[in-house]
């Protein structure tokens, strides 16, 4: 292979010839089809296996980012993390079977077993079984948002523990909104 690559395992960096430098492939079929991708790290069976030209990806775990061919700056951590990504970029996928919402997704951060991202430029915490999200162990964290949306008949309960600073934001409830100047 071209200079400064490390390949350990059956068919790791197998196709690598003249292109691609500074790659690390550890595991059977890891970075197996890489031809011109640079600075990738693949640890695990078939990790980044279909990668051809993509650079700056990190796939740690069996089948992590296995279908990525041209997407850049992706991180997949866990069994089959990001295994649907083919051309998406800037995605962070943490947990077994985590995936962005589409193969060409951009800038999705997805955390938790079996969780699927919802939209580009978004963060998704937890799969459909998650019933609560805590921003701090003691619930003392401050959450900043430009808007807060409540769907259907959902409401904020326990108003003594809830404080919403409306000085520079809009609270969206259902199909309406609350004017912060009122």
Located regions from the model:
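Glycine- and small/polar-enriched repetitive beta-structure motifs of secreted/surface proteins
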Residues: 1-142
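Register-specific beta-strand positions within repetitive beta-rich fiber domains
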Residues: 10, 120, 129-130, 136-182
């Amino acid at each position: 292979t071209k200079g400064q690559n490390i390949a350990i395992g059956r068919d790791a960096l197998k196709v690598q010839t003249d292109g691609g430098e500074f790659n690390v492939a550890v595991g059977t079929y890891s970075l197996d089809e890489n031809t011109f991708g640079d600075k990738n790290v693949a640890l695990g069976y078939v990790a980044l296996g279909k990668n051809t030209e993509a650079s700056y990806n990190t796939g740690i775990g069996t089948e992590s980012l296995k279908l990525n061919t041209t997407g850049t700056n992706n991180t997949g951590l866990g069994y089959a993390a990001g295994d649907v990504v083919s051309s998406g970029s800037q995605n962070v996928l943490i947990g077994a079977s985590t995936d962005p919402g589409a193969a060409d997704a951009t800038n999705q951060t997805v955390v938790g077993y079996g969780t699927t991202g919802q939209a580009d430029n978004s963060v998704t915490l937890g799969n459909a079984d998650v019933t609560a999200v805590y921003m701090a162990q003691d619930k003392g964290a401050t959450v900043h948002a430009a808007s807060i949306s409540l769907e259907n008949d959902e409401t904020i309960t326990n108003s003594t523990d809830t404080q919403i600073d409306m000085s520079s934001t809009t609270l969206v409830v259902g199909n309406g909104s609350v004017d912060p100047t009122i």
